[in-house]
């Protein structure tokens, strides 16, 4: 007798087809038309540690400007489809659209090299654990001291057409069964946020939210004790499918430890008893050790700024195409973080020096200059290309004025005679609603280059460097050759008539 048995072998189904992300070089055609665009001198001045607010209101009188902040420039470019070209025969407006490709960039930095320091008048520093020459007794109620230090040295430059992403450790959410009680360590969570202009960089104390994770406001210096220090999430930006966040980046970091201290306060997690042999004192010193960072010497031999960089091949699928006519340049430079001391005299009549006769102020100034070389590119709008761009970013097609055209209306419309009369409804058409900026909730340093494009590359320093490395020559504006002879003036010939005898 035969019995039916189910097939116990594993059945493998074919994988579902997934759309493939392709490089922009497969549907973008580059032309031999290049433009130079550059910003004006970009300056910022403020207090290096905190913002100063007005006494009568909550408005900021002096902003916080520190050498330890991110500078995120949002560079706005003109729409090439509305650009005035001398010759438009190189593309078809009916079936093609124009885009910009960033091929060269130079971030200029002014001001001298210098090391900026920070500190806290009441830093939670208990003992010197590096060169301890005494037995530690019981700590008092308040052992905070005035300590200053220099920070980790960082030079960074990120280029992309979307805002960069940063990471930091923040306060997580516990499970319902594990509620955090007062005084217990909260759970940590790695958070991703957009890097905005004015965010603090990693200074050597970690990329974390000091506002929620350090309640005493004394474990770190003043400029970060109520801030969030962020670190660029290179792993997330590099793995972004379309490669819009990061075309390429330049990075240089260095740090060493200058001093070793420990912190006052009750140690929340005591040292296990099997890790040491008890002594006669009966109490252990604080094991909350921490170092003071230092970035060491700054030198012009290790600078990544004030140099041209040429983009031949990006790290992602986007090979420098500036979608939505914008570009994001993120800069960090702690090698020019000098804090200037400004002294003002209260009274000039005293001849004897007194400390109370003078007021001390701190200011930090920054200077930037952005220069670009853009290449004009064209995209042929086939059905496959438009479908791919729509799946990538539908707003690109909206900016190109692609959409469904409504059919002509066949209904009878009303037309009033006295349009200004108060007896009839208002006949004024409503203004079209402006397009919302998807990045309006973020803070960037806006740089408008819509009227800064020039085809005369040889008139700019970065343009001349580009012509040299590309092997191109500028078109001469005048002809060189033999000078033309001056026009000769005709003179009247004085001839005498002969008399003819009759």
Curated annotation (Swiss-Prot):
**Disulfide bond in keyword set:** yes
Q: Which InterPro entries match?
A: Capsid_L1_Papillomavir (IPR002210), Capsid_L1_sf_Papillomavir (IPR036973), dsDNA_vir_gr_I_capsid (IPR011222)
Q: Listed GO molecular functions?
A: structural molecule activity
Gene3D superfamilies membership: Major capsid L1 (late) superfamily, Papillomavirus
Composition skew (Basic residues), residue ranges: 493-502
Q: What does this protein do?
A: Forms an icosahedral capsid with a T=7 symmetry and a 50 nm diameter. The capsid is composed of 72 pentamers linked to each other by disulfide bonds and associated with L2 proteins. Binds to heparan sulfate proteoglycans on cell surface of basal layer keratinocytes to provide initial virion attachment. This binding mediates a conformational change in the virus capsid that facilitates efficient infection. The virion enters the host cell via endocytosis. During virus trafficking, L1 protein dissociates from the viral DNA and the genomic DNA is released to the host nucleus.
Similarity annotation? Belongs to the papillomaviridae L1 protein family.
Query: What is the name of this protein?
Result: Major capsid protein L1
């Amino acid at each position: 007798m035969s019995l039916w048995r189910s097939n116990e072998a594993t059945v493998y189904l074919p994988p579902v087809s997934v759309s493939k992300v392709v490089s922009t070089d497969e549907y973008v055609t580059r032309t031999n038309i290049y433009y130079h665009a550059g910003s004006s001198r970009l300056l910022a001045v403020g207090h290096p540690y905190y913002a100063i607010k007005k006494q009568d209101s909550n408005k900021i009188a002096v902003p916080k400007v520190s050498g330890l902040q991110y500078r995120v420039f949002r560079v706005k470019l003109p729409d090439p489809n509305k650009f005035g070209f001398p010759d438009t025969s190189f593309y078809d407006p009916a079936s093609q659209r124009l885009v910009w490709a960033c091929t060269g960039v130079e971030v200029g930095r002014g001001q001298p090299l210098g090391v900026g320091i920070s500190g806290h008048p009441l830093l939670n520093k208990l003992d010197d654990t590096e060169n301890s020459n005494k037995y530690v007794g019981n700590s008092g109620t308040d052992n905070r001291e005035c300590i200053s230090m220099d920070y980790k040295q960082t030079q960074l430059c990120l280029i992309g057409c979307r805002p960069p992403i940063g990471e930091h450790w923040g306060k997580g959410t516990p499970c319902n069964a594990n509620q955090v009680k007062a005084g217990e360590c909260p759970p940590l969570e790695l958070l991703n946020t957009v890097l905005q202009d004015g965010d603090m960089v990693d200074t050597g104390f970690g990329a974390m939210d000091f506002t929620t994770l350090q309640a005493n406001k004394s474990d770190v210096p003043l400029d970060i004790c109520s801030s969030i220090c962020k670190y660029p999430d290179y792993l997330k930006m590099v793995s972004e499918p379309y490669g819009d966040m990061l075309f390429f980046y330049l990075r240089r970091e260095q740090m060493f430890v200058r001093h070793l201290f420990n912190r006052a306060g009750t140690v929340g997690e005591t040292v296990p008893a099997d890790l040491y042999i008890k002594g006669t004192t009966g109490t252990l010193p604080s094991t909350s050790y921490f170092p003071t960072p230092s970035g060491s010497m700054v030198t012009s031999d290790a600078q990544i700024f004030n140099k041209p960089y040429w983009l031949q091949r990006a790290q992602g699928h986007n090979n420098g195409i500036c979608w939505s006519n914008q570009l994001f340049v993120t800069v960090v430079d702690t090698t020019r973080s000098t804090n200037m001391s400004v002294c003002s005299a209260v009274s000039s009549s005293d001849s004897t020096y007194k400390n109370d006769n003078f007021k001390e102020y701190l200011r930090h100034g920054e200077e930037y200059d952005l220069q670009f070389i853009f290449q004009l590119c064209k995209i042929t709008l086939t059905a496959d290309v438009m479908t791919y761009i729509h799946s990538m970013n539908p707003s690109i097609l909206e900016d190109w004025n692609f959409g469904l055209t409504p059919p002509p209306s066949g209904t009878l419309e009303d037309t009033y005679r006295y349009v200004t009369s108060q007896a009839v409804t208002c006949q004024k058409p409503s203004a079209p609603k402006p397009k919302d900026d998807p990045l309006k909730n973020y803070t960037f340093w806006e740089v408008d280059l819509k009227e800064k494009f020039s085809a005369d590359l040889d008139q700019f320093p970065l343009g001349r460097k580009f012509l040299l490395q590309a092997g191109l020559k500028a078109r001469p504006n005048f002809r060189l050759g033999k000078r033309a002879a001056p026009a000769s003036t005709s003179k009247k010939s004085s001839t005498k008539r002969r008399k003819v005898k009759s």
